[in-house]
Amino acid sequence: MKLEDIGVVMLSHGRRDKLEISLKSYEENGLTDMVGDNFIFFNEVANDDINMIENDYKSFEWGGHPVNCGIGWGMVKGIEDCGRKYVLFLENDFELAADKNDIYTQLELGYRNLEKGNVDIIKYRQVKDYIHTSNEAMHWAGKVDLTGHIDSEEGRQGCPEKNWWIGFAVEEKFGYNNSDICEKLDEEEETVLWRMPCKYANWSNNPFLCSKDWFLDLAAKVGFKEMGAPSNTRSPDFEEQIEAGGWWQKQDYRVGILPGLFKHQP
């Protein structure tokens, strides 16, 4: 089971404890052997970072910048160095929480639909991982009173349009019950790939798979053309830049939704 056209690109800055948990999960669950390239880009790279990769995680090659470029430029620099057509992007605190068969099934589903031009980007954070971390998901499910009973169910009405995709984290049959905003695109071994317009599926730096060229073109459109001074509080980073003025929601990109493979470390 090999997906040579996919390259893993990680972005890391500090928190080597979380990075090591993530790297260990990728190797133990077979991800690093399944893809064609493994690369990690360090913001503010340190000797300890380099030593850890070169001594303990030799399936990865590394690059880095001596200063903190910010998440946006870190993403761009890392993805530029990917040696494959498609990029599975991961920040250092996302742990793989799936077995080898599930990993292959979901990655291959995404890969083949990217190849066919059916979708532009696919989310790979486990949707169920949002239920306790996303305000939208918690509001969607409904407010719970002191006795543990739901006293209101807000659903789509209580959620901004750009976050309607979060319904997949809350409702088991969300895709089937909301065919006006999403469609069943493909299926493999009962794993379904859904497609939504980006109007209803906001951008996130959480794990995603897309074409390397598509991402770099997107980055250029939102201002990441040539790096000057490192990002700071007056220079918004990727997630903020792409959401500024509702830019992402005004595009015609198609977002793929899967059950997901990665969970965010607490």
Predicted regions and their residues:
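Cell-envelope/extracellular polymer assembly enzymes that use nucleotide-activated donors
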Residues: 5-7, 37
